From Swiss-Prot:
This is DNA ligase. It is an enzyme of class 6 (ligase). The lineage of its organism: Bacteria, Pseudomonadati, Pseudomonadota, Gammaproteobacteria, Alteromonadales. One of its GO terms (biological process) is DNA replication. The gene is ligA. It comes from the Bacteria. It catalyses: NAD(+) + (deoxyribonucleotide)n-3'-hydroxyl + 5'-phospho-(deoxyribonucleotide)m = (deoxyribonucleotide)n+m + AMP + beta-nicotinamide D-nucleotide. GO terms for molecular function: DNA ligase (NAD+) activity; metal ion binding. Its cofactor is Mg(2+); Mn(2+). NAD(+) binds at residues 63-67, 105-106, 159, 190, 302. The keyword Membrane does not apply. CDD domains: BRCT_DNA_ligase_like. DNA ligase that catalyzes the formation of phosphodiester linkages between 5'-phosphoryl and 3'-hydroxyl groups in double-stranded DNA using NAD as a coenzyme and as the energy source for the reaction. It is essential for DNA replication and repair of damaged DNA. Belongs to the NAD-dependent DNA ligase family. LigA subfamily. It comes from Shewanella baltica (strain OS155 / ATCC BAA-1091).
Length: 648
């Protein structure tokens, strides 16, 4: 058992509650995940404290554990105000005002049997109203795990106690948008952040997404990274009214319960902690009504995450192409959610250090559905050993914030080899230089991209390749220079931090490649979508690759130039500023050519459909599921001919 201690931020939140409680007792209960030693008053205090911390962005126990504690208190005190009222927030965010309409909590069910009991109550209400039960429809939507709020078109309010909330309109003033740029005033919803965006860009800085959601509405200055997420549309207000849904007969629901629940659960790009089921008939809603806390015609279905306690065998350091050393926990093989799990990645070595992850540690891993397993907590910590040397080049590692980093950028095999792999993988026009051939060449001293292009056929032969293979490799290198490639793709192939394909394309809409290397932090930070922290990383990264970049650039690659923003804005095109995605086989030419043409007309071309996509252009052999998913997200689906008519 790892001993739990409230940190300073959590203690500050608890002080605002003004609860009279021995915090040491609460820390012990949280450590043990047991309330056996607490009195009823202490249990109530624990519920208030953990609820307050959760709503403030500092969750300390799992939802399922909180629900079990809540259920035990409710069993003994069913009429207590804490049980019968909406759980209130504790953050002092602004003026408290009456909500335009009540925002109640939702009752919960954890099994199909509980859902059947709820449906029986719906059927009973229908019979009492003389409604044909065969006509009863159930609507199911994802249960967003965000920050609940209400948008009346002019102001944004927190849920508060369900009757009164706090004015947090500052979130919209900071740039927060309604999902898919929908209109304001759609009522209740949640502030959420795109899961993939959080994992890729924010998880190393914030412990969980609730930290982000709370920060968006807080009175204090907002972290630049959060503002950048808002600018990029990763953080949005998602009204419940525009959620994707399944609506159908209750009998159909029970026939394919698991399949329907899974479909709805995975229909959004945000954290979801269940689905919401509700009767659609307004007569049934009015008849069943609500108590002080829940609507009786509505229920949330939640699935318990599958967890397992596993022993750590070792922690293996792996050096990435950026130089960061990632800890990988090797585990005693354990089956969870139908898969054999033997390793999990830990975010960074500071987590290893703080949480005590090392050989002999007992960790709890969790896997929700098909999600990659992660360490949820450490049950039995150990004193971990921190690596001092890079596992690849044996250079002494340095601490940079939470990360151990190898400073040997030019000679570390892992960094140079992975950089070469990344370059050829990103260019995607040369299948002879995969990881195996690159590893072979790197081991023989070919460390840089320009060195690879300097090789002659006889040198490949000297490195152990056959005569025919040597000629093929040489020919492929020469061909890769002649095949047309976008300038943004060429730049992104060098693997600079914060310079993926999307950001490269944005920057090259304002600068040529040569101009970009002269841009300052201030220049880049002024552009839409680039916060200062990103600008600093980009300028530093470009400086690091400048010499190598121009050695390769000067070899004469056939680069197509990204149209400049000023040119795009002057276009009178129906695609200007729109986000389009192409899918399926096209009849009028290659899909890649159509994508390039769409960009020239001012469109942004995506690789997958999201809630921000404007058009999905569907060619031949596109599955019905993909089409329906796009429509549920509010995306207009065009055939190839409809698209051509649009742009002609």
């Amino acid at each position: 058992m790892k001993e739990f201690k409230f940190n300073d931020e959590q203690l500050s939140t608890i002080q605002e509650l003004e609860v009279d409680i021995d915090l040491k007792k609460l820390e012990i209960a949280i450590s043990k995940e047991s309330i056996d030693e607490l009195s009823e008053d202490e249990l109530l205090a624990l519920l208030k404290v953990t609820n307050a911390l959760y709503r403030s962005g500092f969750p300390v126990i799992e939802d399922i554990l909180y629900d079990s504690f809540w259920n035990k208190f409710a069993l003994n005190h069913p009429n207590h105000p804490f049980i019968t009222s909406v759980e209130t927030e504790v953050l002092n965010l602004g003026k408290t005002v009456a909500l335009p309409q009540k925002m109640l909590s939702t009752d919960k069910a954890y099994s199909k049997e509980e859902i059947k009991k709820w449906l029986d109550r719906i059927l009973k209400a229908a019979e009492e109203l003389d409604i044909d039960t065969n006509e009863i429809e159930i609507r199911i939507t994802p249960k967003l795990d965000g920050y609940a709020a209400f948008d009346d078109g002019e102001r944004l309010y927190t849920r508060g106690d369900g009757v009164k909330g706090q004015d947090v309109s500052r979130a919209f003033e900071r740039g927060l948008k309604v999902v898919r740029n929908s209109e304001r005033g759609l009522g209740a919803g949640e502030i959420v952040i795109n899961k993939a965006y959080f994992e890729k860009k924010l998880s190393q800085y914030f412990e969980n997404s609730r930290n982000i959601q709370a920060a968006i509405i807080a009175e204090k200055n907002v972290d630049e990274r959060v503002l950048e997420a808002i600018k990029e549309g990763a953080c949005v207000f998602h009204p419940f009214a525009v959620l994707p849904n399944w609506t159908g007969n209750y009998q159909d629901l029970m026939t394919d319960f698991d399949g329907i629940i899974e479909q709805v659960w995975n229909s959004v790009e945000y954290d979801v902690d269940g689905v919401i089921l509700e009767a659609t008939d307004t007569r049934i809603k009015e008849h069943m009504g609500a108590n002080r806390k829940f609507h009786r015609w509505q229920i949330a279905f939640k699935i318990n995450d599958e967890v397992a306690e596993v022993e750590v065998i070792s922690v293996t350091p792996q050096t990435s192409r950026t130089g960061r050393v990632t800890p990988v926990a090797e585990l005693v093989p354990t089956r969870i959610s139908g898969a054999m799990i033997s390793r999990v990645t830990v975010h960074h070595y500071n987590m290893v250090k703080i949480n005590g992850v090392g050989p002999g540690a007992i960790v709890q891993i969790v896997r929700s559905g098909l999600v990659i397993p992660k360490i949820e907590k450490v049950i039995k910590p150990v004193d971990p050993q921190m690596p001092e040397l890079c596992p690849s080049c044996k250079s002494h590692l340095l601490w940079e914030s939470d990360h151990l980093v190898c400073p040997n950028k030019s000679d570390c095999p892992a960094q140079t080899e992975n950089t070469l792999v990344h370059f050829f993988k990103t260019l995607a026009n040369n299948d002879g230089f995969g990881p195996k051939n690159i590893e072979k060449l790197a081991n023989l001293g070919v460390k840089h991209i320009h060195q690879m292009y300097d090789l002659k056929p006889h040198q490949f032969a000297m490195y152990g390749f056959g005569e025919k293979t040597s000629k093929n490799l040489y020919d492929q290198l020469q061909a890769s220079k002649n095949i047309e490639i976008e300038d943004w793709r060429f730049l992104s192939a060098f693997g600079v931090s914060r310079l993926g394909g999307g950001n490269c394309e944005k920057l090259l809409q304002h600068y040529s490649l040569r101009e970009l290397f002269e841009a300052t932090v201030e220049d880049i930070a002024e552009l839409n979508g680039f916060a200062r922290v990103s600008a600093e990383a980009i300028v530093k990264g470009l400086a690091n690759i400048k010499e190598e970049f121009f050695k390769v650039y000067d070899l004469g690659f056939n680069l197509s130039i990204t149209p400049k923003q000023s040119e795009l804005e002057s276009l009178a095109s129906p695609l200007t500023g729109k986000i389009v995605v192409f899918t399926g086989k096209m009849l009028q030419g290659k899909r890649s050519d159509m994508e390039k043409h769409a960009k020239a007309l001012g469109a942004k071309v995506g690789t997958s459909v999201t809630s921000n996509t404007t058009y999905l252009i569907a060619g031949l052999k596109v599955g019905e599921t993909k089409i329906n998913d796009a429509k549920e997200k509010g995306v207009k689906v065009l055939s190839e001919q409809e698209y051509l008519d649009l742009i002609s």
